[in-house]
Amino acid sequence: MSIDEFGGGQGPHPDVLVVTTNDVPGYEVTEVIGEVFGLTVRSRHLGSQIGAGLKSMVGGELKGLTKTLVETRSQAMERLVEQARARGANAVLMFRFDVAAAADVGTEVCAYGTAAVISPRV
């Protein structure tokens, strides 16, 4: 697997801008819609767990787990964008991820932020 397969985040969404900042340079917030989130929980695969355990003994990247986490984050972000779009937003401000263990059987990834309507400053 190449490093490109573990790229950071989703590609741009043409109708919903997602940023980690409070505002967008050159734009003004015309409406704050509120919190939106995208959530997914992935179960842990026994084979991956065994492989990860062995790999952790000798060191190095756990590529299978890295790939799963990238896919999981992408799915959570896509759900966040879908929710923002459904509520009439064209932007999500203060975007963040939260990752937690889910009852020792999986991993929960939550993408969250503030849905808003922005427009170019005139």
Segment roles from a protein language model:
Residues 21-24, 97-102:
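Short, solvent-exposed loop/turn elements at beta->coil junctions and helix N-caps
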Residues 8-15, 52, 69, 81, ...:
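Terminal helix-to-tail segments of small alpha-helical proteins
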Residues 1-48, 107-122:
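N-terminal presequence-like segments and the immediate start of the first folded domain
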Residues 36, 41, 49-96:
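Short, well-ordered alpha-helical segments
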